[in-house]
Amino acid sequence: MQEVTAEILIERVWAYCEKILSGEIKACQKHKWAVQRFFKDVEALADPECPFYYDAEAVLDFYEWARQFRHVEGILAGEPIELTDFKLFIAANVYGFFKKENGARRFRKVYIQLARKNAKSQFLALMASYEVFPTTEKHRVFIAGWSREQSDEVYQAILEQLLRNISAIVVDQASDLQHRPQKKARKSRREKSTHYRLEFTKAQ
């Protein structure tokens, strides 16, 4: 199996974006705008005065974190989680852009709208657990929904992921952090579609 690199992931994201704009992949107007905004943000990085930089390795970090977990239900149960192009596109936006001033992430709030049966809870659980454990920026993570039952779906998904995988993850992460060279770029580090809002709040 080919080793997945940061370059390969960004090429996947770029190809996905081009398919959205060409019409090869059907998408609503708002999603097309999101793709256009991503292209615009990337192009702006060429300007020396741009206050942001892009770290593809940070996107790879999240991808590798997701791969350490396995599907817990459905026909893929037991298989490692492989981010779809759409979810990789979200990750590339959320985790790739940083501020030159202090190395903090550019985007602090994320709005994700996705139809039912697209593993929303699983994806949000991956993001939430990623914010708590391996990132250099530690956060408190709050999960809110229209009802306690709805928000509990994400919470239970997090528990399911961790209880099934935590031992291996702790060992792998400890080894990885011990041997990984420091990165110079970062200075700190219902039938209808359901709407989720995530806010990452810096822990005191």
PLM regions and their residue ranges:
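Phosphate/NTP-binding elements of NTP-utilizing enzymes
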Residues: 2-204
